[in-house]
Structures are given as C-alpha cells and as structure tokens.
A protein has these predicted regions:
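N-terminal glycine/serine-rich phosphate-binding loop of ATP-dependent small-molecule kinases
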Residues: 1-92, 119-120
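Glycine-rich phosphate-binding loop and adjoining helix at the ATP-binding site
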Residues: 54, 82-129
C-alpha cells in the first residue's frame, strides 16, 4: 500500500510516494517560475501548478502499481488569491502570499481595527499578499 503527498509550494511542486511503514519510496519535484511584474509584486500561473501535478504524478508512480495507492494528501502555499470567472476559469496570475502590493491597506486595518481584534475576528493576521 502507498500514499501520495503533494506539496504545491512557492517555488516547486514536490511529490512523495510513501509506503505503509512511512518510508519515502520515490519523490519528484517540478519547479515553476515566480513572476514579478512590478516591484513588490509576486505572482504565479495556477496553470503551472496543475501542469506540475499532472506531469509529476505519473512520474512518481513509474515502476509502482498505481492500484496500490490508498490515499492522496495535498497542501499548498497559503494566503494566495486565484481569481476565477463564472465558469471557474483562471482569469489572471495568482497573487501570492509574499506579494506586497496591499501593505498600505494592511497598515490601515491594523491601525484602525487593531492587530489583536482583527486576528480574533478573522482567525488570521492581515497579510499584504
């Protein structure tokens, strides 16, 4: 029995194939570029993430019986924005967690609402990305 782990990170998609004892039996990494269209901005194409998964999973399973995969777990970078249209198509590059274009708005929220109050209301901190 095997389990697949997929990590859609900021710089790459990392895939692991783990056996039932928890040992890593195969791993694959597909890097994708960061886009910096303006100073302080940080974006990526969500299509690159999907391509990395679609390409990476068959590579990960090469030489292994896919029928023995019992589960898949995935995780990814947090605090990003993927804008979709009404048909769920991506309409622009994703704005990443490390994008700084809204730092003035974050400062405003922290000053007017307060960091602690904002965190208690949203269960999160205000983030520029």
């Amino acid at each position: 029995m095997y389990f697949i782990g997929i990590d859609l990170g900021t710089s790459a998609c990392k895939l692991l194939l783990v056996d039932e004892a928890g040992a890593i039996v195969n791993e694959v990494t597909h890097e994708y570029p960061l886009i910096f269209p303006h100073p302080g901005w940080s974006e990526q194409k969500p299509e690159d993430w999907w391509s990395a998964v679609v390409t990476g999973v068959p590579e990960l399973l090469r030489g292994f019986d896919a029928e023995l995969v019992a589960g898949i777990g995935s995780g990814g970078q947090m605090h990003g924005l993927v804008a979709l249209d009404a048909a769920d198509n991506v309409i622009r590059p994703a704005i990443l967690w490390n994008d700084g274009r809204t730092s003035k708005e974050v400062d405003y929220l922290n000053n007017v609402v307060g960091k602690d109050k904002l965190s208690s209301l949203t269960a999160n901190i205000a983030f520029a990305g």
